[in-house]
A protein has these predicted regions:
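Non-catalytic, substrate/partner-engaging modules appended to enzymatic cores
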Residues: 11-366
Length: 366
């Protein structure tokens, strides 16, 4: 079948696929990454974020301590107003590395001040190379060593300090009310807008890669784009459950996740397990499609497969992807809220893979 050039994207897309799925040609990400509020009955604070990089500070928390022995150097690096891809490019350039030699536990926001650990081969570290690296808007905070490379997911989570400027006069009270409700029912675990790219076109590129209609040399970028399409499908699944009042309810055949240990299990008796969900001990999960994903059953499977079918794809498209399950909710812990002269300041921790912008959407509704 012949392919046409998408008017929005620099790659070819099947005309049949666009005809079946017109949203793929220009996905409306405002309708997919979280513009549905669990706390819709509570007024938001309004305001603006990220007016300055220092308004959005992120500190990565490692999953484990480092042994200070081994063939990998672990660099705690601080970056300012730098995307993760540009950040990695700087490291590669000045430490003379291939892309796959740079290990990251997670991706970070661009317009922010972020600190995160990066692993590189120990043999590539020298004082002169590190000096050149620090001239690129990057600061080295600490150097340690370990026996293995950092990989995606090797973090406990992130600590955030965020300033909301020009918020409503009642912002502090409004934020507290919203946070209390989210702590009771859980925070929707949507993927945030940064997952989908500045133009919102990463999911379409990811789909084209899956369909063999787009090629990309960089392994890191390929993984990012394919993951973005899977993230969109997860968001659609979560939104559908919220619309049907199934956000905090368990369905027959759900794959539930334990918040304390991360273990997953099949829900065969929803009524029996629901009290644990009400206490936020467990939550239903959504699909991250791939060969290792544990498939839901019964009613839960029907809902997930309906979303997939609505996009014109089948599970076979993801046969080469790893796959997993992602909790629909986050058990939100303590959030510190303080009204300051500059605005409303929030401090909180989120587990790995969760997005501060989703919490801010609920609080600000701006």
């Amino acid at each position: 079948m012949a392919c046409i050039r998408s008017p929005y994207l620099p790659f070819s897309v099947s005309p049949r696929h666009i005809a079946q799925n017109p949203n793929h040609a220009n996905p409306d990400m405002n309708d997919t990454f979280g513009r549905i509020y669990l706390t819709h009955d509570l007024p938001g604070t309004g305001g603006h974020i990220k007016e300055q990089p220092e308004d959005f500070v992120v500190q990565e928390i490692p999953l484990y301590d480092f042994s200070d022995q081994g063939n990998f150097a672990l660099l705690l690096l601080k970056k300012v107003n730098l995307s993760t891809l540009d950040f990695v490019a700087c490291i590669r350039k000045h430490l003379h590395l291939r892309d796959e030699e740079v290990g990251l536990a997670g991706w970070k926001d661009k317009r922010a001040i972020t600190s995160q650990w990066v692993s590189v081969p120990r043999e590539n570290i020298s004082e002169s190379r590190l000096d050149r690296l620090t001239g690129e808007g990057i600061k080295i905070l600490q150097i340690r060593h370990h026996s293995n490379k950092l990989r995606t997911g090797h973090l406990l989570g992130n600590h955030f300090t965020i300033l909301i400027r020009q918020a409503d006069a009642e912002a502090e009270n409004r934020a507290q009310a919203i946070i209390q409700q989210l702590q009771t029912f859980g925070l929707p675990n949507f993927y945030g807008p940064q997952r989908f790219g500045a133009r919102g076109d990463n999911p379409e590129k990811g789909l084209a890669l899956l369909l063999g209609q787009y090629r990309l040399r960089s392994v890191r970028k390929r993984k990012l784009l394919v993951s973005s399409y899977n993230s969109l499908l997860f968001n659609l699944t979560l939104k559908e459950r919220m619309k049907k009042d199934l956000f905090a309810k368990l369905l027959q055949g759900d794959i539930a996740k334990k918040h304390d240990t991360g273990g997953i299990f099949l829900v065969s008796d929803p009524e029996k397990e629901q009290p644990r969900a009400d206490r936020l001990e467990i939550s239903a999960t959504g699909p991250i499609w791939g060969k290792k994903m544990k498939r839901a059953g019964n009613k839960a499977a029907a809902l997930e497969e309906k979303i997939l079918s609505s996009q014109g794809v089948t599970p076979d498209v993801f046969r080469k992807q790893p796959g997993s399950r992602r909790s629909l909710r986050i058990a939100l812990k303590e959030v510190n809220v303080c009204q300051e002269k500059e605005g409303l300041r929030l401090e909180f921790f989120l587990p790995k893979g969760s997005y501060a912008t989703v919490l801010l959407d609920e609080i600000m509704k701006a």
